Structures are given as C-alpha cells and as structure tokens.
Amino acid sequence: MVVEADKKELICSFCSKKQHEVKKLIAGPAVFICDECIDLCTDIMKEESKVALKQITSSIPTPQKICAILNDYVVGQDQAKKILAVAVYNHYKRLEYVQSGNNDVELNKSNILLIGPTGSGKTLLAQTLAKILDVPFTMADATSLTEAGYVGEDVENILLRLLIAAEFNIAKAQKGIIYIDEVDKIARKSENPSITRDVSGEGVQQALLKIMEGTVASVPPQGGRKHPQQDFVQLDTSNILFICGGAFMGIDSIITARTNHSSIGFAANVNIDKEKNNSEILKSLEIEDLTKFGLIPEFIGRLPIVTTLDELDKDALITILTKPKNAIVKQYQKQFELDDAELVIEAAALEAIAEKALAKKTGARGLRSILEHLLLDSMYKVAELKKQRVTITKEVVNGLVEPIMTSLISTKSNKKQPIIEDIPA
C-alpha cells in the first residue's frame, strides 16, 4: 500500500523521506524507494561480495598444499596436478587483487583445458579442487548443449546449476568453478567453415565464448524455455573459473602427422613408435592441433592453460582400487561392514580387475562397474545371512568360480584376515 505523508506528497517506503527531500523516488508495485536507499542497498551488496571473496581468498592453500591434498584422492597425473594447483591458486589470488582496487596491472582470467583418455581422472581433479577451496562447483555435459533457439540445453543452464550449488547466493556463485565435460564433442564437423548451421558443435563454442571470457549473463532461475515470462538473475561470470575436459580421441594422429611421424610413403616404417603411447604423443600438443581437431581459435583463446593427463597403466589402476582415501575397494568394504560382513580381495584378483579395465579401455571409471558386477550376488546374500566373509580370487574375476563365502561365526580362531592382501613386488 502506498504510504503518503499528507495524502499529496509521496514518501519512500523504506526511510520515510518525502519526495522533495531526495533526488529521485522510484515507484514499484504499491511501494516507493528513494535514490539514497538504493545506494545503501548497493553498498550492502558490495560489502557482502567482499566478505564472500575474503572467506575464499583467506583460506587459499599454496600450490604445494593443493597438490598434497590432490594426492590423497587422485593417483598419478603429477604434472597435471602441479599445473592445476598453480592455475587455481593464481586465479583466486587474482580475485583478491582485483577486489583490492589495485589497477596497476590488469590480470586476465586463465581458464583450463584438460585433455586425457576416458577414466584418467579429469572430472575427479576438478571435483577435488572445488572441495579443497570450498567454492560452489557444478558439472555440465557439453554434448547436451545447443545454440539458443534449438532443441537442447542453453549455455545459461550451466550458470543456473552453479547458482543452485551456491543456494542462489550470487556473490558466492560468481567465485565458483564450472567443469564442462566432453568438450571435444562440440568440435566443428570439418576444419573449414560450413555453410550449414552446426548448432551442437561450432554453435555451442560460439555461445560459450562470452560466459567463459566474462560477461553479465541473464540466468533464468526456473529454466529458460518453459517459463519465458520469469525475471532473470544477473550473474557476472568474470571471476568464475571454467575447466573444460575431453578425451579428444584421434588428436594423437593429428599430432603424429604434424611431427612427421605418420606412416606415409615408401620409406615410412608402419610400426614406427609403436612403443610410444598416447600420453607421450599428447605431450607434443600444439594449439594448431586443437584447431585442426575442430575447436575454433576464439574458443581455444579462452582456455590459455592446457594440460594433458597420462593413460593409466595396470599398477596405477591397482593403486586406485586400494590406496586413495575414497578408494573403491574401501567403499565396498564399508558396505559389507554395515551388514556385519567382511570383504577380502586377493592380490591376484586386484591385478585381474585392473587387466579387465585396461582391456575395456575404460580407465578408472570401469573399475567400479567391474567390482559391482563381481559383488552383486554376494551383496544380495550377505544382507540376509550376516557374519559372512566374502573372498574374491583371480578365478572369481575371470568368471571360473563364484565368490567364496565363509561364516565368520564358524571360524575357529575368528581371526580377522587382511582385507586386501599385499601385492608381491
């Protein structure tokens, strides 16, 4: 209801100042607000933004500490960890510098591109970084994105997910991390510009350019297409860190061709560099290789930090199964423990599981599905039987026998066996 001083002169609904006492009085639905109250609200919002940033920047660990924490969760990829740790540290120090009002040198944002085979730890690295820094984090799949106006997700929906992760705290969301997976799938279909519209390839790259570089985006809080009449949330993406990841299948051939190691011509050795795996080839990656693959130069320019991840070998996969804080085997052991049961996996069985994952070319991601398949029947039974010890041998992994189940109650010594046997050197 409009508040009036003498039924003639309007007053501010917040500070009660009369119209002639302020420079401007802005009308809203049944309320008025003066320019002084607007300035006050703006100052409060700026102060909240500073507090949110201070909470983040005051607790930024050094690159060495970030690497040490990453080592607890991610196996191998030492060079990638080092590059990520330095990049993330510098990013949040840059925010502190910008917020201080010091404009001597303009520091640009450095987004990151991770290139590595499926299951090499790209997503896990990004997730772990967000946990270390305690900032809002969201993941998006590039394959579901299309240009605005076409069937599929708009790029603004990525920002909406970040807002949801930040519980719609705009100041906090503006300092978050966005991980875009499968970014290699939005490569344009051919190296040369096409006369037909590529709405899920080059079109998506074009749509991502602005938000990755930094812009004030209009984000639909209820999703963009089903509620066209809604009010939009304004989100500044200038300080959001974008990490893109992809397997980039086939880029090794582009690199090999460029470095004159392709098997072409009479003098070429067809088996040349067979011992040289994809990880070693990727270390020779250049910007022109990404362009030839299908990323447009403007998109590559928004990702100045590029790092490659190594292909995981058998030893690395075995380590992933058992060593990290959230190791897959430890998780299944805890599941069995909740049913008063034990899970024992022999060393030879661990090797067989790793070999299966290598054969499927699924990397670390395939380990869980292999274990889930092996333990399904056992988990189905132990919930009823209780006090059971389930032993997984190499023969069980290879499908020759069923998992061995023995009663813990009937065991004479009832001595607890090692949950994971030591792997012989």
From Swiss-Prot:
GO BP terms: namely:
cell division; proteolysis involved in protein catabolic process
Provide the binding site for ATP: 117-124
Q: Which Gene3D superfamilies match?
A: 1.10.8.60, ClpX chaperone, C4-type zinc finger domain, P-loop containing nucleotide triphosphate hydrolases
Which PROSITE patterns does the protein's record reference?
CLPX_ZB (PS51902)
Which organism encodes this protein? Rickettsia felis (strain ATCC VR-1525 / URRWXCal2) (Rickettsia azadi)
- Per its record, how is this protein called by name? ATP-dependent Clp protease ATP-binding subunit ClpX
Alphabetized UniProt keyword annotations: ATP-binding, Chaperone, Metal-binding, Nucleotide-binding, Zinc
Q: Which gene encodes it?
A: clpX
Q: Which family does it belong to?
A: Belongs to the ClpX chaperone family.
PANTHER family given in the database record: ATP-DEPENDENT CLP PROTEASE ATP-BINDING SUBUNIT CLPX-LIKE, MITOCHONDRIAL, ATP-DEPENDENT CLP PROTEASE ATP-BINDING SUBUNIT CLPX-LIKE, MITOCHONDRIAL-RELATED
A Pfam cross-reference name: AAA_2
